[in-house]
Structure formats: C-alpha cells, structure tokens
Amino acid sequence: MTTKPHAVLVPFPAQGHLSPFLQLAKLLHSRGFHITYVNNEFNHNRLLQSKGEDFVNGLPDFKFVSFPDGLPPSDEDATQSLDGLSSAARKTMLGPFRELVAKLNASPDSPPVSCIIPDGFMCFGLKAAEELGILGVPFWTASACGFKSYFHYVELIEKGLEQEVLDAIKAINPNVYCIGPLNLLEARVPAHDTSRDLTVSLWKEDPRCFEWLDKQKPGSVVYVNYGSIAKMSEGQFREFAWGLATCGHPFIWVVRTDVMRANAAVLTEDYYKEIEDRALIVTWCQQEQVLAHEGVGLFFTHAGWNSTLETVIAGKPVICWPFIAEQSTNSRYLCKVWDVGVEASHHVTRGEIVELIKEMLESERGKERHNKALEWKEKAVAAAQVGGSSYKDFDRLIAEVFRH
C-alpha cells in the first residue's frame, strides 16, 4: 500500500499567518496529504478557548499539535510580543520542534514526515528539515512585492506592477510558486474532503455581524478592522472612535479584547448611546464573509496581506491605515497602482476620517474606485480558475516539489 505523503506546517504564531497556512493545509489534504499543523503552546491553548477541544483534536489524517516556544506563559487573549516571538524563533524553537518531528516519525498513527513547510519567519523549520534529511519548503504568506522587498531589504521597489515583481523574483530564484489567493483555490476543495469546513481563529467570532448587516442598505456599511497585531494610543483610538461616530454611515468596528480593555475610557456609555442603532462593535468576526456581504461598501484596513487579498476577492474599495512590515507597500498597491482606495495619514484625525469615508462612499471618484475594485475581483477569480496562473502554479508545486 502506498504511504501518504506527510506535510508538517509551521505558521508564525499570529492570526494573519495561521489562516493562510490552514488554507494551504486543506489544499494539500485534498491532494492526498496527511497533515500535521503545528502551533506554539500559547496559540494552541487559545484555539482550545475559541474553537473548542473537538476542533483541536482534528481529524484522523489532519492533526493539530503544539510545541513549547520558550517564552513566559501568559493568559492574555492577544498576540504575543513580536520581538519575543522573533527572538524565540532564532534561539529556542529549533530543539523542541526537532523533538516533535522525531515523535511524529516514531508514531504508528501517522506516516513518516516527508516535508516540512515553515513560515518564512520560522526558519528553524528549514534547519530541522536539513538536519533530519527531510524536504523543506518555506511558505511566504504575504505579497510577492513584500517578499521582494525583504529579499533585497535595502532596495525598496518603487516602480512596476505585481507581475514585474514576480518575474524579477523568478529570474533570481525560479523555485518560487505564486499560489494565492488561497481563499479562492480553497473553494475548489471537494465537498467530500473532511478538512473542507475547518477554520482557524484565535478569537471567538461574533455571530451578530450578519444579522445586523442584513438590516442595512446595500453598499452603505463601513467595515473597520486593523488586524490581529496593530495597537493604537488612546489619542488615536479616540480619533477613530469619533470619526466613525460622526461619518454619517453605519459601521462595523472590530475592536480586539486587548484593545477594548486599553481604551475603556473612550468606549463609554455616552459613546455607545451616540452610535446606537447605526453601529456594531465586536471583538472579532468572519472577515471574508463580512466583506462579501452586499451591505458592506467600504473596508477601513491596516492593509495586511490577508486583508488585501480578501478585499480584492470581495471587490470592495478601501481606506488604508498601514501599521507595520510590508503594509505600506500593500497600501501603495491598493491606492496608487490598483486605484481601489485612499490612504489615511499616520496621525489621522476624526475630521480626516469623516472626509475619507464621504469621498469613498459619496463622490464620483469613490464610484470609480469601486468599479476598479470589481475589475480586480475578476482578475483574482480568473487566476484561481482551472488554467489560471495560481491554479497552474499550485499544480506545479505538487508535481515538481512534493511529488518529485
């Protein structure tokens, strides 16, 4: 009997990395792979809280496991320190991860590990693969332009379209497979595949969003979410809160529990009275489904790559407020190259927020950007269809790397 290939996936411990890794895992599972999805212990415990024990137990051939990261224990419902995680990835994670792979290889419940797929920021996974004589294939979860920027860190890309960036990367290293948007490829996972309905979220998702959206006029709602990491000063948070409250449009605002606790002085009873009946504040939601809802007309985002892809797939225009990493590059593409949005200034005020929302939802220029967003949606869908560039690259990845 042929042994299933066994892929061990190791995402960076942040929500924006966990989601695309799960999408890739499901795609590989649909192609006959046994999957082991590896979290650090902190996030494994958070998944227990948000998704329950049945989810974490996984499926017979799709397992969720954990290993210690060497960081101090914490009960906070928030992403760990990026500095601490980056340091641990360099200094303390290799040994425990190597031991985990050895246990997987010795287990009678799974085939031997045939490949390790670490996040681009979890390079110890490649070191472990090299030491154990196993195929190592890093997965970069952000944009091609972001990858290019990191690849040549001091040479920032200022000109060119995404395709030119991809061509430049492949000229340097031909073994780059551009398989996004994974959201659309994932939709092709067969209905009978047992992993199809798996989702991963470190926060409990609020189900009220869709009932509330169903009551709103099409294209009227501003959806606001700054991702799993971004933090604001109380002054910034106050400007956002009152800018949204006075913009004249209904809005859904995702405010993580850690951000909500830090800004209790802003989200007062008086504030909730001000926005009553025309706004919904939640701690987390199913973003892809919210963006796809006809009630949403505008996305106010930090321009993380997952959010960038999800808004393109939904065909929705944006206001960008980039925070870290390559988010400014993503914002530049969204606003300057693809022309589907505008960027807020770093020290944005409530008045600017009101002006930008009105420009995007009430002006002719806003309508033009909305039409552009629909054009980019069509291009994304075409890339993921049979014969499209992403579909073909995923087939090449399976044939040339994992089946080689």
Where is each model-derived feature located?
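Glycosyltransferase specificity loop/lid
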Residues: 1-404
